[in-house]
């Protein structure tokens, strides 16, 4: 990392519904700015510690509600990174539905990509961002992607994924996620496949650095 003596790191917020392509967009930004000092910070890492709850209680939690996240910790650690201080990033265990005992040591970088479904819901988080991006993708495509991801990567069953989508993911998207589109500086249709939007975004970041 080369510390910028004239300003703090640049923070890019990437949000959108579950399965919208946020990770693809974040990775595309990361790859296009590969000559820079970057890191990706995912909101999913900051789900609440639920180790004191039973497994049945954990299953009943609405993971698509803002209160499911330890936003205070996320804000604290972003501020540490903005001050060029390292952090111990939490690790979330998707199979146990709680935070792992492990952490990941993360050194500060000149560009911080913050990714998550609800990162624009909290004004304190928005105020830390230089550029805010909303990835806008059709509902049908998002649910198909979520089913494929959760079964393959998170050990979920088809019934549990569909049940969660209908019970919480879809209604919470319309209640909390979609309204945050108004805070976005850039709305990206078609996610990471939108090369024009990615080029515009990375050009803007280079102009700030």
From Swiss-Prot:
Q: Provide the protein's localization.
A: Cytoplasm
**GO BP annotation list:** CTP salvage; UMP salvage
Q: Name one GO cellular component term.
A: cytoplasm
**What reaction gets catalysed by this protein?**
uridine + ATP = UMP + ADP + H(+); cytidine + ATP = CMP + ADP + H(+)
Q: Which InterPro entries match?
A: P-loop_NTPase, PRK/URK, Uridine_kinase, Uridine_kinase-like
A GO molecular function annotation here is:
cytidine kinase activity
Spell out the protein name for this chain.
Uridine kinase
